[in-house]
Amino acid sequence: MAVNIIATRAAPKMASKKEHQYCLLDSQEKRHGHYPFSFELKPYGQTGANIIGVQGSLTHVIKMTVFPFMIPFPLQKTHIDDFIGGRIYLFFKELDMQAVSDVNGMQYHFEFKVVPVSPNQVELLPVNNKYKFTYAIPVVQYLTPIFYDLSGPLDFPLDTLSVHVDSLSNHIQLPIQNHNLTTGDRVFISGYKHLQTIELCKNNKIFIKYIPPLSSEKIKLYIPKNRIRIPLYFKSLKNV
């Protein structure tokens, strides 16, 4: 019995190259109205004004790398022993279709070892700092990081507050009660170029030795110890 063999030509493969993009998710540049964190990544943009700038577009992402970084103690924790198992997990909401699932059904992209650094901060050391996607992510425009441990999601103290300043009595009225500011903390007041030291902290008022005259009574108070910066490195596959 004769067999007909039909020869076919394979479709030519598109040549591809790998591009690398570095970005720093800075909590002071999070999107307005999104708590606790949500970031917009803008191609060829400049970091600032609530934008995280990247050199090129984040398309066809095949791998994501994270590096060690610092975080303040979450609101749910007061001591290093409060971190169950000494681990924290990081999950990106927009990438939920591809993530690691643990035995409890919780998803994450990175696992970290928690290392104490000071009474206010811990360092997160990646257990495995690379996550490879099974299928390339078409585009990454927004990233919403969610932190949790085995007890559940973790919330963090704010790193920026809108405050009322009284230059005559050298005190600042804080809009919240559950802040983590204490005497001796360093803060930055918008409109003034130097860090200030808190002389006294009483309820939701902080007193500073010298507050310069400011053009507006309602200004921004930046709290360096609460700032979170997540360093990420993306690898993309581009057709050429």
Curated annotation (Swiss-Prot):
Keyword annotations of the record: Late protein, Virion
Swiss-Prot/TrEMBL induction comment: Expressed in the late phase of the viral replicative cycle.
Protein role: Forms the penton at the fivefold vertices of the icosahedral capsid. Together with the minor capsid proteins (p17, p49, and M1249L), forms a complicated network immediately below the outer capsid shell, stabilizing the whole capsid.
Protein name, per record: Penton protein H240R
Keyword GTP-binding: no
Chief place where the protein resides: virion
Entry's Gene Ontology cellular component terms: virion component
Places the protein is found: Virion
Cysteines engaged in disulfide bonds, as pairs: none
Organism of derivation: African swine fever virus (strain Badajoz 1971 Vero-adapted)
Keyword ATP-binding annotated: no
Family: Belongs to the asfivirus H240R family.
